[in-house]
Amino acid sequence: MTVRLILAKGREKSLLRRHPWVFSGAVARLEGKAQPGETIDVCDSQGKWLARAAWSPSSQIRARVWSWQQDESIDIDFFVRRLNAAQQLRDWLALRDNLDSYRLIAGESDGLPGITIDRFGNFLVLQLLSAGAEYQRAALITALQRCYPDCAIYDRSDVSVRKKEGLELTQGVVLGDAPPPLLPITEHGMKLLVDIQTGHKTGYYLDQRDSRQATRRYAQGRRVLNCFSYTGGFAVSALMGNCKEVISVDTSQAALDVARQNVELNGLDVSKAHFQRDDVFKLLRRYRDEGEKFDLIIMDPPKFVENKNQLMGACRGYKDINMLAMQLLNPGGMLMTFSCSGLMATDLFQKILADAAVDAQREVQFIEQFRQAADHPVISSYPEGMYLKGFACRVI
């Protein structure tokens, strides 16, 4: 008999709207014993069945919903169905945008909570972020073998969020060959090198694909400052948009070395590309004091906020760094600025930019809005899936 999670009275409303999470405060009791990650049935306070979910006793998210169908088994065939459904969207995107790399599974928005899978050519890079995902590891890998027999599988479940689920960090070859130190991929006509084994996340920020392409529209003849550049995707795009020059700034020399290789790989003029290892906050202040000016600044910082307690501090950080950027722009210059913090709402981010403009004694015109690329879909019942937001601002 399947273990049942009984909700507290009145706490079923979010599940009736198909939100896939059950928080600890919504749980009245667990009827039976379940191992971490094991599949359980979620019921309302009267015992009415609501969903099939994975049990996670160590997390504030006590259960993540696998299925809304009572008779659906969570097995290899289940994962095959989910993978095939997700692939339909990616096939269309790959054909439309001439892609060989994309996010194959975007967690909850593809009906597989706690699971991220990125495809880079014939390498599938796996991140299992929840107890349920880890519990189903063998079934998922078998399903991947069935759906993608020609692909190698590499595990990058080396992220700290696993600790909240009571899980150890894991990394390494799961199936097939190990990825090369740098794997070439294509994106909107660009060739880019990806470090699957030691790079950020799964190796590359696929979610910024559309924003990188948009850079070409703003780069023509401009002097560009590319902040938090990582491996230079925005720099390559700016050069392809015929910028005057681009300075890429990052704290990682290894990332900057790959950025230079990416410029060379695309046959672009390396003399127009400069790579600087530095702290962006300190460099912006130094540039301001030295009177440096730019025509386009790209601001793509790492996540500033991990939980609600950090939100106020993150607001100050975003305001400060964007104020400094605005002070460095020539009149009519463009600022492309982003936040990848899910807790930072789009309207709040826009207000922060408006406040930054006041402090910079400038005005901004919001020209264009950005979001994560379409291979990172957001399902209607899970608005938390919308985490990346950005604006193109004309600073006057």
UniProtKB/Swiss-Prot annotation:
InterPro entries the UniProt entry points to: PUA, PUA-like_sf, PUA_sf, RLMI, RlmI-like_PUA, SAM-dep_methyl-trfase, SAM-dependent_MTases_sf
Database matches in Pfam families = Methyltrans_SAM (PF10672), PUA_3 (PF17785)
| Extent of the signal sequence | none
Show the SUPFAM superfamilies listed in the entry.
PUA domain-like (SSF88697), S-adenosyl-L-methionine-dependent methyltransferases (SSF53335)
Q: What is its EC number?
A: 2.1.1.191
What is the annotated role of this protein in its UniProt record?
Answer: Specifically methylates the cytosine at position 1962 (m5C1962) of 23S rRNA.
Which family is it part of? Belongs to the methyltransferase superfamily. RlmI family.
NCBIfam families with a match to the protein in the record = PRK15128.1
What name goes with this protein?
Ribosomal RNA large subunit methyltransferase I
Please give the organism. Erwinia tasmaniensis (strain DSM 17950 / CFBP 7177 / CIP 109463 / NCPPB 4357 / Et1/99)
Q: Top-down, what is the taxonomic lineage of the species of origin?
A: Bacteria, Pseudomonadati, Pseudomonadota, Gammaproteobacteria, Enterobacterales
